[in-house]
Amino acid sequence: MGVRFLFNFFLISYIAIGQNDYIEYIPNTKEKLPMIFIKGGNFMMGSEKSEIGHFGDEGPKHEVKIDAFWIGKFEITWNLYNLFVSREIDQYQRSKSNSDEVSIDVDAVTGATTPYVEMSFGMGVDDFPAISMTQLAASKFCEWLSAMTGNFYRLPTEAEWEYACRAGSDSAFNFGDDISKLKDYAWYDENSEDKYQKVGTKNPNDWGIHDMHGNVAEWTLDQYSPISYRQRKDKLTENPFVEPIKVYPRVVKGGSWMDNQKRLRSASRRGSSKQWKRQDPQIPKSLWWHTDAQFLGFRVIRPLNTPPEKLQKKYWGY
């Protein structure tokens, strides 16, 4: 009886801990990463033609089922991203025996090169979102973060990102359709003063996530296709992911400090472009930086169910 009680106690404790928000502390640094738990569920992805600002690649609206995951409460900041770029704390990586989900040597993770120019472009570093990295660099950051913490992190799929952004809403924005309220939730071209702002300074959505509209647009894992939604018409699709087969274009979501209101809608999507490297002084162009994408950043997710090692590497750009 006592054994059964203890088993039930630990099982309940595991469930309670395993499906709550938490803070990931980066070993041997002052940095931390608050993570919000997102329950799995169904939602309608995309937008109707009647939605103000609708683009053709946002339809048809279709039903999607998403598994549970955690997502960063904030966009990744320079404070954290620069640890990856400088790699000064790699000597403190977790060993395999301390790793809960991943078993990789942090020294084996490819690191982004130090850029030739100051990549914040004078807009701010402390608690400001990191910008201008390529999708590969963002994915390698996720691999590095996984090695440092022992927990598996990756970029969100486009569907996961939109599910988290909407937070149960079915409107143009996660707070509704009243565009006059956008200034309370987002930094965009009308209020940003021509630069990004510190993360978390606007209202969060109903699930507690900040800056899903505006501040910086955000990378997802998917290859961009203007017709991908048509293939999901009139059926339920579980955890959709358009696996990349080429470098460009990849899906970017959320809109930024440079964008107008329509670009900040939950359904809005755009594809990346090699033109974002146009002013890159390196020859050949850098694998790690999009010098002309001063509007672009990312946030991370951690799936509730950790994938096998082979799939982890695929998510990290191998």
Task: Report each predicted region and the residues it spans.
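Short, well-ordered junction/capping motifs at the entry into regular secondary structure
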Residues: 186-213, 243-246
